[in-house]
Amino acid sequence: MQTLKVDLGERSYPIYIGEGLLDQPELLAPHIAGRQIAIVSNETVAPLYLERLSKALGAYSVLPVILPDGEAHKNWETLQLIFDGLLTARHDRRTTVVALGGGVIGDMAGFAAACYQRGVDFIQVPTTLLSQVDSSVGGKTGINHPLGKNMVGAFYQPNAVLIDTTTLNTLPERELSAGLAEVIKYGLICDKPFLGWLEDNIKALRALEPAALTEAIQRSCAAKAAVVGADERESGVRATLNLGHTFGHAIETHMGYGVWLHGEAVAAGTVMALEMSMRLGWIDQSERDRAIRLLQDAGLPVVPPQEMTPAHFMEHMAVDKKVIDGRLRLVLLRQMGEAVVTDDYPKEILQATLSADYRAIVAQL
């Protein structure tokens, strides 16, 4: 087992990474204050892991709260089901909410914990690669709004993150690839040597080889923890973690939540960010193409939806958390391994990026 730390002073917390951690309640015990636990999961993950985790936490009074699965349910109506469960079971301020699932479950359970009785303890037990390397770390919680993704939420840090890498053995291939989009992101924004490692190990990762998965998760979480420790509330460097996300969120919103997985939309959005970085003269074509090939090798889409026009993108990107005083800030690459957040770019470069023929770009690789 490996243990990392998210350093936030008195609110610091550990990230445990290893095999079989669901069966080690002693890891979670120091982070549970009361006797009540609510395990929030979904209809897909609960049949696989709820009984196992509940048994490990048998010393506590465990309430299961099972939600419908998918991004389409990341909304007010589903959030209310968590509150309904907590109130019906008369959970008090010393309850601990445990998120058992992927990014949607983690975001909603965390938001519920932030709101319930003005804040109760919260533990992340992520079961997808995307949630293990990204969304479970850093305290971003929330739900979607019909007009924009993740527009209603709170920064609310967990007490601990427990990553049992064996849960990836039941992850569908498409979901695994979606998680690899976030892993690749870390190489692009802050760890160029990691890109080379990923190129050498992408087949091993897709084959679920334990050593490769553990290495990728550890390096990704270490990068995320360092950024969150330096900028918890995304006033500066943390925004670089959103490479590809502004374009990607536009895709998710336009296509309908859940039609494209988050990681798939981020992958296509990353290609657009690479294209814009190249058009600004910050990276060259060979570097753009190298990153696109890696995304392809991960089994990810690298072309935005054909039905989305530049006007569609502009409409959705106008409702983005990175819009400040009416100006859209974008995360781009100053060079491979170094990201920048900027609103200082010619509008014609953005328009050219939105209008680019990505099918032709990919065809020439």
From Swiss-Prot:
Cofactor(s) this protein cannot do without: Co(2+); Zn(2+); NAD(+)
Organism: Pseudomonas putida (strain W619)
Source domain of life: Bacteria
Pathway linked to the protein: Metabolic intermediate biosynthesis; chorismate biosynthesis; chorismate from D-erythrose 4-phosphate and phosphoenolpyruvate: step 2/7
Top-level EC class as recorded in UniProt: lyase
Function field: Catalyzes the conversion of 3-deoxy-D-arabino-heptulosonate 7-phosphate (DAHP) to dehydroquinate (DHQ).
NAD found in the keyword field: yes
Annotated GO CC locations: cytoplasm
Protein's gene: aroB
GO MF term (any one): metal ion binding
Keywords for the protein's UniProt record, in alphabetical order: Amino-acid biosynthesis, Aromatic amino acid biosynthesis, Cobalt, Cytoplasm, Lyase, Metal-binding, NAD, Nucleotide-binding, Zinc
Entry's cofactor comment: Binds 1 divalent metal cation per subunit. Can use either Co(2+) or Zn(2+).
Signal sequence, start to end: none
Protein's recorded name: 3-dehydroquinate synthase
Ligand binding (NAD(+)): 69-74, 103-107, 127-128, 140, 149, 167-170
Protein family (similarity comment): Belongs to the sugar phosphate cyclases superfamily. Dehydroquinate synthase family.
Matching PANTHER family: 3-DEHYDROQUINATE SYNTHASE (PTHR43622), 3-DEHYDROQUINATE SYNTHASE, CHLOROPLASTIC (PTHR43622:SF7)
Any Pfam family matching the protein: DHQS_C
EC identifiers of the protein: 4.2.3.4
Catalytic activity, reaction form: 7-phospho-2-dehydro-3-deoxy-D-arabino-heptonate = 3-dehydroquinate + phosphate
